[in-house]
Amino acid sequence: MNKVKVENIVSPGSTRLVDAEKYGAMKRAYLAVVPKSAPGATPAQMLERMLENLPQDLFPGGAKAGWWAKCVQLDLEAKGIVKRAKGSPVRLHQ
């Protein structure tokens, strides 16, 4: 199983190795639905849209999709690809 190193904006400098195939599939689905500009969308709204784009062999019935979406979100935020809008609830955009 190939691994990819992910960052976490909540824990700067901290990295974790995760399954590269699942990460890549979720990242593609995530970037396909995250709005290009503020105010963006909530993580729950994006997850709902992502579920239809995920490969069933990796995420059967959406299994573990929430965890992987959060993993990708925090990594993309740490890399500056995705940004949080100010205020509540959490809204994300590119």
Language-model features: where?
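A short, conserved structural fragment
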Residues: 73, 77-87
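Long, low-complexity, charged/polar intrinsically disordered regions in eukaryotic proteins
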Residues: 1-32
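Short, positively charged loop/turn segments that connect secondary-structure elements
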Residues: 51-70
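Short amphipathic alpha-helical interface segments
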Residues: 22-56
